[in-house]
UniProtKB/Swiss-Prot annotation:
Record's keyword annotation contains Transferase: no
Record Pfam families: HMG_box
Protein localization: Nucleus
Protein name: SRY-related protein MG42
Protein's UniProt keywords contain Nucleus: yes
Amino acid sequence: VKRPMNAFMVWSQNERRKIMDQWPDMHNAEISKRLGRPWQLLQDSEKIPFVKEAGRLRVKHMADYPNYKYRP
């Protein structure tokens, strides 16, 4: 069972697609590096929708998997 997405992951889904459309051969690690800085530069108020969605996903995950325990 996968962990629920955090706010950065929710935001980066769409942004990652945009980068992959422009540079389809770019490695995932490089894409992640390119996504990190813009996320850091977002104002807290701009992050609110992604934080809320991550919270909703976390609650749903807890309901779907009540005995889930993260084990890397």
